[in-house]
UniProtKB/Swiss-Prot annotation:
It comes from Latilactobacillus sakei subsp. sakei (strain 23K). HAMAP family: Ribosomal_bL36. This is Large ribosomal subunit protein bL36. It comes from the Bacteria. One of its GO terms (molecular function) is structural constituent of ribosome. GO terms for cellular component: cytoplasm; ribonucleoprotein complex; ribosome. Belongs to the bacterial ribosomal protein bL36 family. One of its GO terms (biological process) is translation.
Amino acid sequence: MKVRPSVKPMCEHCKVIKRKGRVMIICAANPKHKQRQG
């Protein structure tokens, strides 16, 4: 999980979701692409 000030999808499999008011990226194809904002 990367924590970054700005999160962007890294590949076509990355999905942008919101959990508890936080913007997150989850990726089924490459778990290294997981990110959280803040």
